């Protein structure tokens, strides 16, 4: 513990807050090009084939982002928009692909939570 005199001389240095989504550079969304689209398995108690894409962003950073919803049309060279938001059971996946924007189609036959999956209102 510092003495009063040490605090008078130096003072306390506030800690810097570290960003959870550094590749976004303070932007709400970023555009990028898929370099690889593949499936991966989640951490221990869960079991599935989660769809993810490696995306090269406009700032030249490569990130892994999750493709939400059932079915997708993404392949290599697809242009996507990503947002922040990690996937808890996939280590290293800190971003989500936005559905229904640019080359990504919305989820087909989606009735609830449509806005999150880029699905149009059913007739």
Swiss-Prot record:
The modification 3-methylthioaspartic acid is found at residue 89. Belongs to the universal ribosomal protein uS12 family. SUPFAM superfamilies: Nucleic acid-binding proteins (SSF50249). The gene is rpsL. PANTHER family: 30S RIBOSOMAL PROTEIN S12 FAMILY MEMBER (PTHR11652). This is Small ribosomal subunit protein uS12. Gene3D superfamilies: Nucleic acid-binding proteins. Keywords: Methylation, Ribonucleoprotein, Ribosomal protein, RNA-binding, rRNA-binding, tRNA-binding. HAMAP family: Ribosomal_uS12_B. One of its GO terms (biological process) is translation. With S4 and S5 plays an important role in translational accuracy. GO terms for cellular component: small ribosomal subunit. The keyword RNA-binding applies. Residues 9-19 have a biased composition (Basic residues). NCBIfam families: rpsL_bact. Part of the 30S ribosomal subunit. Contacts proteins S8 and S17. May interact with IF1 in the 30S initiation complex.
């Amino acid at each position: 513990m510092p003495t009063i005199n040490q605090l008078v001389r130096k003072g306390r240095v506030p800690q810097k807050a570290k960003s959870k989504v550094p590749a976004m550079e303070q932007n709400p969304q970023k555009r990028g090009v898929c370099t690889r689209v593949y499936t991966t398995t989640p951490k221990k108690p869960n079991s599935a084939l989660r769809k993810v894409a490696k995306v090269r962003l406009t700032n030249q950073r490569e990130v892994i982002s999750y493709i939400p919803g059932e079915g997708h049309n993404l392949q290599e060279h697809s242009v996507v928009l990503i947002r922040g938001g990690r996937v808890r059971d996939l280590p290293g996946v800190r971003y989500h692909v936005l559905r229904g924007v640019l080359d990504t189609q919305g989820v087909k036959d989606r009735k609830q939570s449509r806005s999150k999956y880029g699905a149009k209102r059913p007739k």
